[in-house]
Amino acid sequence: MKFNPNLFLAWFWILLGFVTGMVLGLFFRDEHWLGGYGSFQRRMYRLAHISFFGLGAVNLLFWLTAQNVSLTGPFAGVASWAFVVGAITMPVCCGIMAHFPKAHLLFTVPVVSLILGGALTLTLVLHEPQSVKAANTAGPAANHQLSTANSP
């Protein structure tokens, strides 16, 4: 199987979500850790933690969409890397913001990257070639790998 950055990042980010959850969980019983549960610092760490899961899932969904719809061309490549950049920079920005709240403009990088990736993917899905649409609507036998139902 050819290396795909979105698939790799998806599962690596999900793993990091588990690991960061474990690390945060070591300290959650301390009411005053990072300024207490409602503190800005602690909220940013929680946001970084959950972004690993959410953006890992987004990259996995992009990879699955690219496989199912056969996304190709330069816009598909830009969308792919936009999701990777957004996923990598979001938890980094959360960590920086936890300690330097005035650096909030850093969030422009992950937010714009993710919006770009989402907009390009939606555009590509809406304008998928007719030959691919015909293959995808041919019936249940069009994609044997995704089917788990037993045929009668």
Regions found by a protein language model. Give the residues of each.
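Polytopic transmembrane helical bundles with strong interfacial aromatic enrichment
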Residues: 1-49, 53-152
